């Protein structure tokens, strides 16, 4: 069965985020996974709204894949801590979207 993979990374303040998330999205999809991509959420909501939605997506995911540079995102750091706290499986992606 395919894994449900949530992509975590920096969105706010990164003008390249759509390209980075799309690249990781396609990589995971090509591996046969179902991709949960927060870059596809509508714009214009408050950060707390996004976090609530993203944590629900993480709860539904089998695995959370972190993009390079996630540490510089307050939201992704919360997601990482949430994964650690709840025992969610995680992996770090390399610069190309490949596993490190």
Listing of model-derived features with the role each one plays in the protein:
Residues 1-100:
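Conserved catalytic or regulatory cores that recognize and/or transform ribose-phosphate-containing ligands
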């Amino acid at each position: 069965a395919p894994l449900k993979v949530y992509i975590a990374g920096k969105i706010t303040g990164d003008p390249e985020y759509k390209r980075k998330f799309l690249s990781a999205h396609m990589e995971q999809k090509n591996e046969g996974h179902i991709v949960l991509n927060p870059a596809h959420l509508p714009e214009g909501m408050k950060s707390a709204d996004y976090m609530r939605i993203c944590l629900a997506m993480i709860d539904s995911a089998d695995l959370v894949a972190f993009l390079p540079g996630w540490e510089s995102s307050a939201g992704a750091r919360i997601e990482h801590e949430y994964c650690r706290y709840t025992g969610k499986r995680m992996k770090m992606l390399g610069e190309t979207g490949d596993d490190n």
